[in-house]
Amino acid sequence: MLDKLTIKNVALIETAEIDFGAGLNVLSGETGSGKSVILDSINFVLGAKADKSMIRHGETECSVCAVFRCGAAVQALLSDMGLDADEEVIVFRKYKSDGRGDIKVNGNPVNAAMLRKITAHLVDVH
């Protein structure tokens, strides 16, 4: 379950921190208020491809950090991958205007394929 999302320099968002509650969470608001940016940020931290257009105008990089609560199956997967396994999974992803980026899971560097394998077990976006 997604507990917290921190977004920095993504599209029109300079900094945003969102705490999600248990159960169903709904994003609502007027046109242009940033709902799609939040969904794009979630997809980005889950492993979707990034491009320069997502970086806020005037900045050189953007980042998204997501905190998930997970069960034993995800903990076992993390352990099998040689990563720190706990009830909390922290996924951090940064993308720079030069096309480079960093991905970390619980502070450990991972590649995009590993990220997608892990996050496939953490959240469903509909």
Summary of predicted features, one role per range:
Residues 3-126:
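Gly/Lys-enriched N-terminal cap/neck module of very large, oligomeric protein machines
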